């Protein structure tokens, strides 16, 4: 890839290059083409199951937590053990919208394609700040999967082009089928926020 097609930060370039590989694998040749992580999931041997299908297996206490008071504490979950055919079971939070589901699933797809060792999320201890941390949780791995997934869903080159055209984060989000929050995250980490604000302001003044 040409350096002009990549974000200015080292970490951003790292994620973008890996994201480009994923998009190429998905058969996408243009940066503005939306990526559907649900189509990629089967190649990553991920089986996405609706929450309704596993709900009968859960206790009332668990259900109340997952879709009640704890609904904002999780986006999706992967079974620790694979199915007999080798696929891994993925459950997405039913209280989240489809745009957020796409980002969550894309992160899980990236874990597989990047060769990450699965993180186990059993509670083990509290850190120095008193916050509960998970056993075997690797922040670097989680950041790489999320960053790569976000870059695959919203490529830098397309993002930069749309910002130059004066498109809003909401318009870009609709195009790629993701949340506005994810678009604005990408704008900021790609160091395009100042350009975005300038162009949006200029568009409104016309």
Where are these regions (language model features)?
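Active-site hotspot residues in diverse enzymes, especially metal/ion-binding acidic/histidine motifs
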Residues: 1-206
